[in-house]
Regions:
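Short hydrophobic/aromatic beta-strand micro-patches
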Residues: 107-109
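Short glycine/threonine-rich catalytic loop with a Thr-x-Gly-x-Asp
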Residues: 95-104
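Glycine/small-residue-rich loop that forms an oxyanion/phosphate-binding "nest" at active or ligand-binding sites
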Residues: 1
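Conserved, helical-rich catalytic subdomain that frames metal- and/or nucleotide-binding sites
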Residues: 4-96, 111-146
Length: 146
């Protein structure tokens, strides 16, 4: 979401309202779309949601240190999301596998397109997804600079 609001890859603090530009390594992603719709309001209202997470600061932020507090609650309430995420975590060559935002999509990051495509070819027939290249900034920024 930050790239659409801010125009660049961004590190979000607070509840996502404090954005700072961050340089990330080039990456490819496999995104899985579980066959459920997660209610963001339901997840944020959940008593199981961790509300006292210590903030991560930049620097020395590492993408591997981050986490999504909503992920555990969504996976508990929506087994389809948990199944997709667990499948991604078992793949070779992933740097991370996480849930996107409040769900239901989950993703795995790969260093190369070839690694992402090999993983995608293993996708079970009962799962839906796609492969996408990570962007450093929103493509409309290029048009604005022409």
């Amino acid at each position: 979401v930050p790239v659409f609001i801010f125009g660049h890859n961004a590190f979000a603090e607070g509840i996502g309202e404090q954005l700072a530009v961050i340089e990330l390594p080039a990456a490819w992603y496999m995104v899985l779309v579980p066959p459920v719709q997660v209610s963001t309001a339901e997840i944020f209202a959940s008593k199981e949601l961790t509300r006292n997470t210590l903030p991560i600061k930049i620097p020395p932020f590492s993408v591997w240190q981050g986490h999504n507090d909503l992920e555990a609650v969504v996976c508990q309430r929506y087994p389809e999301v948990a199944r997709c995420l667990e499948w991604l975590k078992r793949l070779e060559h992933t740097t991370i596998a996480r849930m996107s935002g409040s769900g239901s999509c989950v993703f795995a990051e790969f260093a190369t397109e070839a690694e992402a495509q090999v993983a995608f070819e293993q996708l079970p027939s009962n799962m839906k997804g796609f492969v996408a290249k990570g962007l450093h900034h929103h493509p409309l920024r290029d048009l604005m600079n022409e």
